[in-house]
């Protein structure tokens, strides 16, 4: 059973601001002090305050690879803890010290604590000694400048084991201008993942999207082909 930590503000996702609206005000905070300032000031409109419902479903339906898992841009750590189990050790990665402090405060006493860890590192340069069987990305791809996406794909390839699986929750599939979050499409993922050696195994709608993200997300599962 996935452990789900909820907070009073976003316990059911209904209060989460639509991505098109977030893109109107979030860039100012990011420009002023990066993602650390967002967490320091509590400007985290993407944080659902609980594990992503789709992640909970994948865990409870035993639809995730076992072994070592990675959640880049883990923020408050909700998805990390939901995925963690005796059969799956999960690393939550973030560049914000404040985000990881919040994650540790929330989940430090979790009965799952020995099955996950939080690490402050830059996803683009961090290379651990051991690779991963599973990587889950929801918010990194849409948060980075579009010209940085090829580097994101390269890092994914280098961090994943040859037989590992990359799961991307494609978001936000909209037509808004600016960001973060920057708009995405299936093709924007394909354009950077296919050239480095990934193949999409499946791409489908996310039936577990929260209200303000319905119709704006797709679940894609990728495997290395070379």
From Swiss-Prot:
UniProt keyword annotations, A-Z: Methyltransferase, Phosphoprotein, S-adenosyl-L-methionine, Transferase
EC nos: 2.1.1.n4
Entry superkingdom: Eukaryota
Gene Ontology BP term (one): methylation
List of residues that carry Phosphoserine: 85
Catalytic reactions on record: thiocyanate + S-adenosyl-L-methionine = methyl thiocyanate + S-adenosyl-L-homocysteine
Tagged with keyword S-adenosyl-L-methionine: yes
Residues the record lists as binding S-adenosyl-L-methionine: 35, 39, 46, 73, 94, 122-123, 138
GO terms assigned for molecular function: S-adenosylmethionine-dependent methyltransferase activity; thiocyanate methyltransferase activity
Homology family: Belongs to the class I-like SAM-binding methyltransferase superfamily. TPMT family.
PANTHER family: (RAPE) HYPOTHETICAL PROTEIN, PTHR32183
Role noted for this protein: S-adenosyl-L-methionine-dependent methyltransferase. Probably involved in glucosinolate metabolism and defense against phytopathogens. Highly reactive to thiocyanate (NCS(-)) derived from myrosinase-mediated hydrolysis of glucosinolates upon tissue damage. Also accepts halid ions as substrates.
Name by which UniProt lists this protein: Probable thiocyanate methyltransferase 2
Species this protein is from: Brassica oleracea (Wild cabbage)
Gene responsible for this protein: TMT2
């Amino acid at each position: 059973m996935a452990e789900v930590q909820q907070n009073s503000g976003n316990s059911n996702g209904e209060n989460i601001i639509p991505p098109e609206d977030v893109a109107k005000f979030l860039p100012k905070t990011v420009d002023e002090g990066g993602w650390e300032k967002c967490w320091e000031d509590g400007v985290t409109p993407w944080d659902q305050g609980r594990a992503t419902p789709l992640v909970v479903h994948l865990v409870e339906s035993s639809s995730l690879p076992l072994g070592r898992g990675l959640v880049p841009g883990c923020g408050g750590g909700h998805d990390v803890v939901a995925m963690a189990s005796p059969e799956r050790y999960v690393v939550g990665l973030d560049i914000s010290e404040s985000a990881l402090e919040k994650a540790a405060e929330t989940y430090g006493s979790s009965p799952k604590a020995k099955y996950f860890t939080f690490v402050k590192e830059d996803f683009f340069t961090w290379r651990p000694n051991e690779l991963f069987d599973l990587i889950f990305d929801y918010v990194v791809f849409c948060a980075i400048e579009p010209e940085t996406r090829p580097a994101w794909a390269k890092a994914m390839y280098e961090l994943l084991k040859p037989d590992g699986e990359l799961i991307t929750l494609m978001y936000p599939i909209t037509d808004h201008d600016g960001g973060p979050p920057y708009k995405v499409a299936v093709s924007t993922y394909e354009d950077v993942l296919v050239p480095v050696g990934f193949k999409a195994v499946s791409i489908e709608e996310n039936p577990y999207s929260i209200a303000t993200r319905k119709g704006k997300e797709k679940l894609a599962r990728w495997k290395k082909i070379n």
